[in-house]
Amino acid sequence: MIDLFDFVVLSSFIILLPLVTDFLNNTFPNAKIGRLAQEVVGMILVFFIVSLIFAGVSLWYTHFLPFYYTKSLLISFDTLNLLDLLKFINTDNNNNSGSSIFNKITFYFHIFFTIQLVVNLYYYYYQTITADNFLPKISKNKQIQLFASETTTTTTTTTDNINEKKNKLCGLCDQVSDGKWSTINKPKSHHCRICKRCIDSMDHHCPFAANCIGINNHHYFILFIGYTVMALIYACYLSFFPYYHCIVNYKNYVSLSFTNDNDNDNNNNNNFKQLAQSCAKFNKYSFIFLCCCLIVTASFGILLFQTYLIITNSKTVQLLSRLKKSKSFLDWFKWLYQNFKQNASINNIYSLFPNFKFYNLIIPYYKRKINKLNK
């Protein structure tokens, strides 16, 4: 029977799989491995990401935060969760000791911090996976009317000008629709072969969102990645304590718990014994720390890459296209450096996050969507 630990480990590896397929697809573009994987597992990844956040909150509630405060006292409760922990802290706080008051303050901080993390994570992820970045479809009849009206209203229109405007129509959209409709290309628009539509200001097709990252959700995607990194760092911090006590130093605690050289060490030995028993109860959940480290490393890499894109006003598809044209990785890295020197500006960040305020670090940020006519 699969338990919460097995689900977290399974989800961690499943979520990381698209990174491998993307790497293979970009390194060997003719193989099209990544494209096939994204088409098949997109919504499955969404399910696992949503479920993994919920599983993380459950483990935080029932395991890691209680262990963070109680450690050796964990064994004294049959099932220890936040309600039991709150009673324990309030009871201990009656002593009015400095450490007890500090524990109570930090306990409420952990509660507040986790709630705002979860709210922001779900909000930004929802906005990322539901955003519509498609360029409007233009039917064959509308194309004829459009070019006919331009011909009649513009006295200087030539055949070459009309052909130039027709060339702005996406040929791939025309193929997908069997000539029934197409879209007019815009600067930085790109045809997604997975969505089979042209995306306004496309950055990339994200397998983790089963959606393209474009004009209406790029900012939400970056904020989601940022809060994911923040949540994972917090998870690494809390999960480190059971990993350290129950994996790294477990043998020492077991040996010390049965060492009674003198009466002065009896209390310490009892604490070590209780901690050893607590670790036995914690069991394999101590290894969650390793899963957190694995995912936070990958997420932080994505965040760094997206930060570069924001500062330089670049897109992932643009960088990958440049990579394919480069003779070597060294030439590509030189181009990345030159691109940073020429285009890096703090104004690029402001343009992507207009009206972003300091309080949006806690309260979710909202950016008005770009209206699309004649969709």
Swiss-Prot record:
Membrane topology (UniProt): Multi-pass membrane protein
GO CC field: endoplasmic reticulum; Golgi apparatus; membrane
Subcellular location as annotated: Membrane
Glycosylation sites: N95, N343
Transmembrane segments: 4-24, 40-60, 105-125, 221-241, 285-305
Keywords tagged on the record: Acyltransferase, Glycoprotein, Lipoprotein, Membrane, Palmitate, Transferase, Transmembrane, Transmembrane helix
EC number: 2.3.1.225
Domain DHHC: 176-226
Family, per entry: Belongs to the DHHC palmitoyltransferase family.
Protein name: Putative ZDHHC-type palmitoyltransferase 8
Organism: Dictyostelium discoideum
